[in-house]
Amino acid sequence: VYIDPGDVILVESPTFVHSVEIFEMFEAKCIGVDMDEDGMKMDDLEAKIQKYHPKMIYVIPTFQNPSGRTLSLERRKKVAELSAKYNVLVLEDDPYRDIRYSGEDLPPIKCFDTVGNVVVANSFSKIFSPGVRLGYVMAEPETIHYLTEAKSATNSHTSMLPQVLCAEFFKRGYYPAHHKMLCDLYRQRRDAMLECIDKYFPEGTKHSFPDGGLFTWV
């Protein structure tokens, strides 16, 4: 919908490799933005916006793949501010936000979007079933229109069966207990992994300690 050959997309460094592959399939150029413990660094982001004039900023703000880091509240506000200041689209990919073990939920970048430049993409595959490839988008009506047209041109529509199954799952109230089970299970796996890293990896090895999600960075 938005990408043309030669467009620049700013991405976190590191980021989800499959997204980079998709962007490059449409002949876009991906430029990495430095990160620290609070996610994408805003000074580097603004400098690269000024230098490369990107079409889009791609960010995974919560429990990022692959680092496990979470973009801080102030930086979420700043991303929205820079998006408005330089008129750059933001693709906020946020499929891990509901898999939280501790800490407070942070509002999406979209909450601070004053000009309609932020598009949120989310997924049911992480919280319902990995085999059910369903997701959703939150965006301005015009953007939804173009995305719907593009979706129709690729495969007409997503199969109705997984859509109905997912809808009924939530409608019948199964999600709260399922969500608790998921978080308990993944928390145990995180703790076991970090314990093994501390015990068996070479002395001096450092790792992130994510409050949720499916990733840690060693």
Predicted segments, located by residue:
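Substrate-binding/gating loop at the entrance of the active-site cleft, primarily
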Residues: V11-A28
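Conserved core segment of the aminotransferase class I/II
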Residues: C111-D184
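A short helix->loop->beta-strand "cap" motif at the edges of active sites that frequently abuts
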Residues: D7, A28, K55, K85-L89, ...
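Conserved glycine-rich beta-strand-loop-beta hairpin in the small C-terminal domain of fold type I
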Residues: A167, D184-L194, G204-V218
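Short beta-strand->loop structural element characteristic of the AMP-binding/adenylate-forming
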Residues: L10, K29-E37
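Active-site phosphate-binding strand-loop segment of PLP-dependent enzymes
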Residues: M40-Y101
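Phosphate-binding glycine-rich loop
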Residues: V1-V8
